[in-house]
Amino acid sequence: MTQSNSRASGATRDHLGRPIVAVTGIGLVTPLGIGVEESWAGLLAGRSGIRRITRFPTEHLKTTIAGQVDLPEEAGHGPLTSPGRVERMAALAAEEAIAGAGIGRKGAFPGPLFLGMPPVEVEWPQRLDLARGGVGAEGSKYPALIAAATGRTELFEGALFGGVGERLADRFGTRGAPIEITTACATGASAIQLGLEAIQRGEADAALCLGAEGSVQPEALIRFSLLSALSTRNEDPARASRPFEKTREGFVMSEGAAALVLESLESARARGATVLGLVLGAGERADSFHRTRSNPDGGAIIGAMRAAIADAGLEPGQIDYVNAHGTGTPENDKMETLGMRAVFGEGCPPISSNKSMIGHTLSAAGAIEAVFSLLTIRDQRLPPTINHETPDPAIPLDVVPNVARDARVQRVLSNSFGFGGQNVCLVLGAAA
C-alpha cells in the first residue's frame, strides 16, 4: 500500500510500518515579525525584512546589512548577546507552537526537546570588559582575562552550549535530556529530523523541535565576510538577497527562530488535536569535501533530496513544490539547480527561496522554512522569490519570480544545505 493510500484510509502507520508524524503546533520569529501570521503575511506580500544594521557600528565593514529581529525587551536597552537572543527567540517560538498545539499542561511538555542552535562564545564587548578588568598592560593577555573572569558565572553560563537547551527544557518541562545540535545551515532541519525519528522509533509520542539563530553580531559578520560569502549590496538592503538571479553575489545574514510540535498521528487524533500537516520523511547526506564548499559533483545534495523523497514513500513526480535552500551565493544556487535537474529531470516543480525576503537565518533556516512549507500547503499559495530581475540562463527553473502564486500543493520538499557538505532535506505533506 502506498503511503498516500495508507493515509487516505485513516491508518496511522506509513509505508514502512512506522508511526506517521503530525505537526500540531508551529511558532515563528523572523525579521518580518514575531508570530506565524505576521511573518507569513509579509512573505506572501513579497516584503523584505533586510535593512541596515543598527545594533553595532558598521563604518569599516564591507557588509552593513542584515535581517535583524527587534526583541521587545531590547527597546531602550543594549542588545542581548547572541546566546541570549537565541534563547529568547526560541522561547517565543516555542510558546506560540505549544499554545497552538494545546498540548500538555503548563510547564509540562510530554516529550523531548531537540534544539538546533549555533555554537556560542564570549563576544567582543565581554572580552573588552574583561580586558579592562585586567591589570595594566597585561590586561589583554589570557591569564589576566581568566583572572578577571573569576566569579563571573554569567559569562560561563551564557557561553555554555548546552546551557540554552537546559534552560528551555526547564521552562517548558520537556522530558529527558535536551538535545542540542549544530550542523551548519542544516541545523534547524536536523532538529526536526531528530524529533521525527524519535517518534518513528516509538521512543516518544511527541517532540518539541526548535531552530534558533542570533548571530547578527560583529565577529560572525566579519567571519562570513572574509569567506566572501556575504552580499555587499548595502545601498539598497531590500534588494540585496537575490537567490537564483543572474546578479546574485552573496547571502544576507539574518536571525530568527521556529518551533514545531511533532506528535504521532495516533496520539494527535486521540487527543482531538488539529493536525497542521505531516512530516513524511527526511534524508541526509554529507560529502566531507571542504570546510565551506560542496563537492562540485552535487552527490550529497542529490542524495539527500532523493533519500528524503524515498523515506516518504514517494516518487519525485509526487512533489508539488520545493522550498529552496536558495542562499543567493553563486555556487549554492548553481548546485541546487544541478540537484533539481538530477532528481526531477525536465519536469522540475516550482521552487522558491524564502531567503530572498528574510535572509539566511543560518541555524534556524531549516526549521523556519519547514514552517513556511506547511503554511504553503495550508493556504495553497507559493511564496515568491523576490528581486528576480535578470533571469540566469544557467538556472532553467520556475523560481516563482517576485509575486506569490496560487497552486495545488500536497507535498513539499524543503532543502537545507550546510557548510562542510552537511545536507538535510524534509518532505512535508498535507494532513490526512
What is each PLM-predicted segment?
Residues 2-79, 101, 117-119, 266-278, ...:
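ACP-dependent fatty acid/polyketide chain-elongation machinery
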Residues 90-102, 161-165, 169-172, 178-213, ...:
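Active-site-proximal alpha-helical scaffold in enzymes
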Residues 1-23, 106-110, 312-318, 396-432:
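Flexible, low-complexity linker/loop segments at domain and module junctions
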Residues 155-156, 176-183, 245-249, 351-360, ...:
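Short pre-catalytic strand/loop immediately N-terminal to key active-site residues, enriched for Gly-Thr
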Residues 135-151, 193, 197, 214-269, ...:
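Glycine-/small-residue-rich "gating" segment that lines the acyl/pantetheine channel
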Residues 20-24, 47-52, 235-312, 321:
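Condensing-enzyme catalytic core mediating Claisen C-C bond formation in acyl metabolism
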Residues 23, 44-179, 212-221, 316-332:
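Conserved beta-ketoacyl condensing-enzyme motif
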Residues 203-249, 282-296, 324-333, 348-398:
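Acyl-CoA/ACP chain-elongation machinery
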